[in-house]
C-alpha cells in the first residue's frame, strides 16, 4: 500500500466475536496494517476459532496489544479516525463518508501514527469515545439496515484507504507534524485546570464546555507547534495568577 503514514493501527473496542477478531487479523495482513490493538475484549481473541479465521494474519493475533481504556490505546497516534454507523452524527462537521475522510487523511504530507477505531458489534462507539477521534466516518449503506458486520466494516474501510493512497492528488500536501493524541490530552488537562481556577468552568457544566473545546481542537488538526504555543500561554497565565 503506497502511503504517507509510517504506522497504521486498527483498534477494536470490546469485540465479542472471536470469528470477527480472526477475520480482522487476516485483513490486517491483506492491507499491510502495522498493528492490531484491542480494547477490553469480550471474547477469547486467542481461541482456535479466531486463529483459524486469521490464516496468514495469525501474527497480528499473537502480537496484538490489549488495553483497558480507549484513550490509552491512541496516546501515541497523530491522527485518529473512528467508524460510526449512526446516521444522526452527520450533523457534526467532523463527520464524513469513508471515501471523503480517507482522501482528506492522505492530504497530509506525513503522519507518524494513524489509528482507525471500530466499535462494538452490537452498539458501536459511545459519544464520548467518538469525541476522542479527529474525524468520524460512515460507510454508506441502506437506511433500512445501516449496520455492518464488524469485519466487513473493517474490510471496506481498509479498501477505501488503500484506494485513496493510490490516487494522484492535485492539492498541495499539508506539511507539518500533527500533535499526538497524548499531547492533546495533556494540554486539555492543563487548560481544564486553568479554566476551573479562573472560574470559567463550574463542576455542573464543565463536561459539556470542555467537550466542545476538545471538539474544536481536534477538528483543527492541530500541529505539535500549535499545541506547544497553547501550553506556553496556559503556563504564562498560571505564572501571572501567582503574582495577583
Predicted regions and their residues:
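Mobile, glycine- and charge-enriched loop segments
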Residues: 1-15
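S-adenosyl-L-methionine/SAH cofactor-binding core of RNA-modifying enzymes
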Residues: 48-125, 166
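Amphipathic alpha-helical repeat scaffolds
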Residues: 16-23, 146-152
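Conserved small/polar residues in nucleotide/adenosyl-binding loops
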Residues: 242-244
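Structured adenosyl-cofactor binding patch, chiefly the S-adenosyl-L-methionine
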Residues: 30-31, 129-173
Amino acid at each position: 500500500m503506497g502511503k504517507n503514514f509510517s504506522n497504521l493501527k486498527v483498534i477494536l473496542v470490546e469485540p465479542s466475536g472471536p470469528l470477527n477478531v480472526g477475520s480482522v487479523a487476516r485483513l490486517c495482513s491483506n492491507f499491510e496494517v502495522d498493528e492490531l490493538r484491542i480494547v477490553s475484549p469480550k471474547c477469547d481473541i486467542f481461541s482456535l476459532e479466531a486463529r483459524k479465521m486469521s490464516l496468514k494474519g495469525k501474527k497480528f493475533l499473537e502480537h496484538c496489544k490489549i488495553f483497558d481504556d480507549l484513550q490509552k490505546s491512541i496516546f501515541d497516534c497523530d491522527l485518529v479516525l473512528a467508524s460510526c454507523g449512526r446516521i444522526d452524527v452527520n450533523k457534526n462537521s467532523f463527520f464524513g463518508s469513508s471515501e471523503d475522510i480517507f482522501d482528506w487523511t492522505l492530504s497530509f504530507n506525513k503522519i507518524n501514527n494513524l489509528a482507525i477505531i471500530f466499535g462494538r458489534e452490537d452498539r458501536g462507539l459511545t459519544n464520548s469515545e467518538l469525541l476522542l477521534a479527529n474525524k468520524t466516518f460512515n460507510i454508506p449503506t441502506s437506511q433500512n439496515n445501516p449496520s455492518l458486520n464488524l469485519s466487513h466494516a473493517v474490510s471496506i474501510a481498509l479498501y477505501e484507504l488503500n484506494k485513496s493512497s493510490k490516487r494522484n492528488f492535485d492539492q498541495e500536501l499539508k506539511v507539518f507534524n500533527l500533535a499526538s493524541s497524548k499531547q492533546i490530552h495533556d494540554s486539555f488537562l492543563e487548560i481544564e485546570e486553568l479554566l476551573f481556577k479562573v472560574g470559567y468552568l463550574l463542576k455542573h457544566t464543565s463536561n459539556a464546555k470542555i467537550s466542545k473545546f476538545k471538539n474544536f481542537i481536534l477538528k483543527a488538526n492541530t500541529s505539535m507547534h500549535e499545541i506547544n504555543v497553547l501550553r506556553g500561554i496556559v503556563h504564562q497565565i498560571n505564572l501571572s495568577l501567582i503574582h495577583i
